[in-house]
Amino acid sequence: MAIEIKAPTFPESVADGTVATWHKKPGEAVKRDELIVDIETDKVVIEVLAEADGVLAEIIKNEGDTVLSNELLGKLNEGGAAAPAAPAAAAPAAAPAAQAAAPAAAGGDDAILSPAARKLAEEAGIDPNSIAGTGKGGRVTKEDVVAAVEAKKNAPAAPAKPAAPAAEAPIFAAGDRVEKRVPMTRLRAKVAERLVEAQSAMAMLTTFNEVNMKPIMDLRSKYKDLFEKKHNGVRLGFMSFFVKAATEALKRFPGVNASIDGNDIVYHGYQDIGVAVSSDRGLVVPVLRNAEFMSLAEIEGGIANFGKKAKEGKLTIEDMTGGTFTISNGGVFGSLLSTPIVNPPQTAILGMHKIQERPMAVNGQVVILPMMYLALSYDHRLIDGKEAVSFLVAIKDLLEDPARLLLDV
């Protein structure tokens, strides 16, 4: 029985997809729940699995084709046998026996010479084995050597080797300056579209501050082993502290957690924090739902799970949809300072950066401290400068005195 292979049902936010990769060819056997084809959307790659054991009968939509929700991609013959493998080519006939050895040189490997002939040959620098003997039994006589010497004298001189041509300027091979044109992936095209949209539709501005990371680093160093043991291998990183600090600051400044819808301002009564994660396809932003209620361990576990799914290409559209505020950490790549771009319809994004030791003035003394620059990009249509600066200072204060996160002060 033929089974139709269809594209999945896309959410309302996804209009169509692109056939990225067929993992099977027509005639190949397929097992139930085995990956057949990948469909790339603006946000994620969706895997289409086989509904039953069988053989891939037909591919209707080829790689690179655009497909709609539930559109037919191909057909699977349930329970069919795979096409038989092509018979192996017949083994080549055995090579014929080697031909008889070429006749020996005129004088043989050990030519027979008279003492006088051998002495003359050595004086003339002639190999006796190269002289054809005319004596009895092929013996090389003195006359044979004399004849060989005369023949060598009368032989025309070898033409002189032509002088090497002057070196010419190097010529680049065609492949040294090759260009390759490939279509954008759907994710890259969507990112490009959204970034241009954000730049043109928002009154975007960035404010900066810096945070002393020593208190967080000391706390992490003191408890990281116990934390990992207590929470089944979940590692304590810096991102969880930033998420907790952000959720607390968002409670104090709800406008930073809001969005604009036409002429309305939508204040969200929840905090869904997007965390930028690097993947082979590019930067993706999965969302921690209701982050204000999550513990440090739950935040770290969620981020680690997102990172694993991103690496394996298994992030779902649900993982990537929504978000009321975003945190991006360019510091993991070595960025010292940047101006992150707001992801609409959100109105703000926090940028973390590289921790770097710098001399700082503390109580009149110069102290070397691990410092990090913070950047908050925001939509000035909704958020005033005072509110943005105060929000960033609140995050700074919470991170420099992490006990305040526990005491809610």
UniProtKB/Swiss-Prot annotation:
Keyword hit for Acyltransferase: yes
GO molecular function: dihydrolipoyllysine-residue succinyltransferase activity
EC number(s) on file: 2.3.1.61
Protein name: Dihydrolipoyllysine-residue succinyltransferase component of 2-oxoglutarate dehydrogenase complex
NCBIfam families: PRK05704.1 (NF004309), sucB (TIGR01347)
Gene transcribed to yield this protein: sucB
Keywords: Acyltransferase, Lipoyl, Transferase, Tricarboxylic acid cycle
One cellular-component annotation, GO: oxoglutarate dehydrogenase complex
Pathway: Amino-acid degradation; L-lysine degradation via saccharopine pathway; glutaryl-CoA from L-lysine: step 6/6
Residue ranges constituting the Lipoyl-binding domain according to the UniProt record: 2-77
Role according to the record: E2 component of the 2-oxoglutarate dehydrogenase (OGDH) complex which catalyzes the second step in the conversion of 2-oxoglutarate to succinyl-CoA and CO(2).
Catalytic activity: N(6)-[(R)-dihydrolipoyl]-L-lysyl-[protein] + succinyl-CoA = N(6)-[(R)-S(8)-succinyldihydrolipoyl]-L-lysyl-[protein] + CoA
Subunit comment: Forms a 24-polypeptide structural core with octahedral symmetry. Part of the 2-oxoglutarate dehydrogenase (OGDH) complex composed of E1 (2-oxoglutarate dehydrogenase), E2 (dihydrolipoamide succinyltransferase) and E3 (dihydrolipoamide dehydrogenase); the complex contains multiple copies of the three enzymatic components (E1, E2 and E3).
One protein family per Pfam: Biotin_lipoyl
Necessary cofactors: (R)-lipoate
Domain Peripheral subunit-binding (PSBD): 112-149
Domain of life: Bacteria
Family to which this protein belongs: Belongs to the 2-oxoacid dehydrogenase family.
